[in-house]
UniProtKB/Swiss-Prot annotation:
InterPro entries: FAD-bd, FAD/NAD-bd_sf, FAD_mOase_fung. It is a multi-pass membrane protein. The chain crosses the membrane at residues 7-27, 450-470. It comes from Epichloe festucae var. lolii (Neotyphodium lolii). This is FAD-dependent monooxygenase ltmM.
Length: 472
């Protein structure tokens, strides 16, 4: 390590290990404090790597190891309650446009690769649950449950949606009267859905490279093929507010009852969910939080990843945005260090710059996720009509929606871009709102653009005119 500046990273998962890799590249000293007893536990979860995450991992020299573990997706099949289905080539379109495949692998294996590729493994500590953080004039101290204390210049919370670092930021803001004592820390977070995720083996009638989606009323089922006959899946189900406590307390029993009730759901013409559920090797249920937290930093403390935002897995951007956060923060830190030592006032400006760089994109990607999870569950007449009667006939529209959010992604600015990423689709602006509908036309095949544009404008105008009052 070449810099005297030191960073404590709380949390050794996707965001934390990605930041560790970035800091290692710029020679900044760090330590990762992970509360669990393993860096890569088997929890039954999968992880989706999209081109925006893949490009950064490629810059870090990691993506080739991940590519060895994946079965790239080529197409996706969407099935509706009335039996209608349509096929989208969006995974292949994204691969062609951005140079990286859409792929899924076990989260455990992904974390193990991130750890194995880290040179400074001696800077990663497990069984280190941070319980408090105290800020001094020129340093910050993190105390762990075993009584140990760790000193650094800044602390970065990569510790998930229930972040202790974010809680400490909130505490400091209140103590210094910078927010109202009545302001709730989770006021911007929604709790409308729960997710059951799992892994099944040797499921019949599965074709490699295809994603299967069953979009039903109040529930959606999503299947992704992986290597070694593995099938990664998750079920998103609308959950009454009164049921969330039950999900958290007894999620195994609740998940089992829900999955048993979905046995007869057809996810394709030849496959029922029973075929998947009966071959399940591991599963877990968790409430889904959605939204962007208001406060990301205070003093020498800042958060990244799920500690600043949480979204449903429908758009596959959760882990990829966490990787982007690590990259963005490292870009800013590298610029500061290149101009000499970092002063106290530089730290606050650095975190403010990070917030400005990531917040607009974060809010847009989260808005897309919120829209997709509700459209997939047929929530609201407007979304139901859009999903069933408009999108299936727009050919590459799913590629347009995904490509729009990927195109404006962050990259590591102090490492050259890999050759495979030098494609024309990168760099288009991400403005959010309803502009994604028009922006999606960029990714359609040229000969279809005019026809689809006219059809889209006419159909959208009709739907908005007749049904705008029906949107929640």
């Amino acid at each position: 390590m070449t810099s005297d500046f030191k960073v404590i990273i709380v949390g050794g998962s996707v965001a934390g290990l990605s930041l560790a890799h970035c800091l290692e590249k710029i020679g900044v000293s760090f330590m990762v404090l992970e509360k669990g007893n393993q860096i890569a536990p088997q929890l039954g979860a999968s992880i989706g790597i999209l081109p925006n995450g893949g490009r950064i991992l490629d810059q870090l020299g990691i993506f080739h190891s991940i590519e060895d573990e994946i079965e790239p997706l080529e197409s996706a099949m969407m099935r509706y309650p009335d039996g209608f289905s349509f096929k989208s080539q969006y995974p292949q379109a994204l691969h062609t446009s951005f140079g990286y495949p859409v792929a899924f692998l076990e989260r455990q294996r992904f974390l193990q690769i991130l750890y194995d590729k880290l040179k400074s493994k001696d800077c990663v500590f497990t069984n280190k649950r941070v319980v408090s953080i105290a800020s001094g004039q020129d340093k910050v101290t993190a105390k762990t449950s075993d009584g140990a204390k760790y000193l650094a210049d800044i602390v970065i919370g990569a510790d998930g949606v229930h972040s202790i670092v974010r809680s400490e930021i909130w505490r400091h803001l209140k103590e210094n009267s910078q927010i109202s004592v009545l302001e709730a820390p989770n006021a911007s977070i929604k709790h409308d859905y729960s997710c059951i995720y799992g892994i099944s083996l040797n499921v019949p009638q599965i074709i490699l490279g295809i994603q299967l989606n069953c979009l039903d009323d109040g529930v959606s089922i999503h299947l992704f093929t992986g290597k070694q006959s593995k099938l990664f899946w998750f079920v998103i189900i609308k959950t009454p507010q009164a049921s969330f406590a039950k999900v958290e307390i007894d999620n195994t029993h609740t998940a089992r009852c829900i999955c048993e009730g979905l046995r007869t759901k057809k996810v394709s013409d030849t496959l029922c969910f029973e075929d998947v559920w009966s071959r399940c090797t591991i599963f877990k249920m968790t409430p889904l939080e959605e939204g962007v937290f208001k406060h990301w930093n205070y003093g020498r403390l800042a958060c990244i990843g799920d500690a600043i935002r949480k979204m449903a897995p429908n758009n596959g951007q959760g882990a990829n945005m966490a990787i982007e956060d690590a990259c963005s923060l490292a870009n800013i830190l590298q610029k500061k260090i290149s101009h000499g030592s970092i002063r106290d006032q530089d730290i606050n400006s650095m975190f403010q710059e990070f917030s400005m760089a990531q917040r607009a994109r974060t809010e847009s990607v989260c808005a897309q996720s919120e829209f997709l999870v509700r459209m997939h569950a047929n929530q609201g007449i407007g979304r139901r009509l859009l999903g069933r009667y408009l999108i299936p006939f727009l050919y590459d529209a799913p590629a347009g929606l995904s490509g729009f959010s990927i195109s404006g992604a962050t990259r590591i600015e102090f490492i050259d871009l890999p050759t495979r990423s030098l494609r024309g689709a990168w760099g288009k602006s991400w403005r959010g709102s309803w502009e994604f509908i028009l922006q999606s036309l960029v990714y359609l095949r040229p000969k279809f653009r005019i026809v689809y544009a006219l059809y889209l404008v006419a159909a959208a105008a009709f739907i908005l005119y007749c049904l705008s009052s029906l949107f929640p």
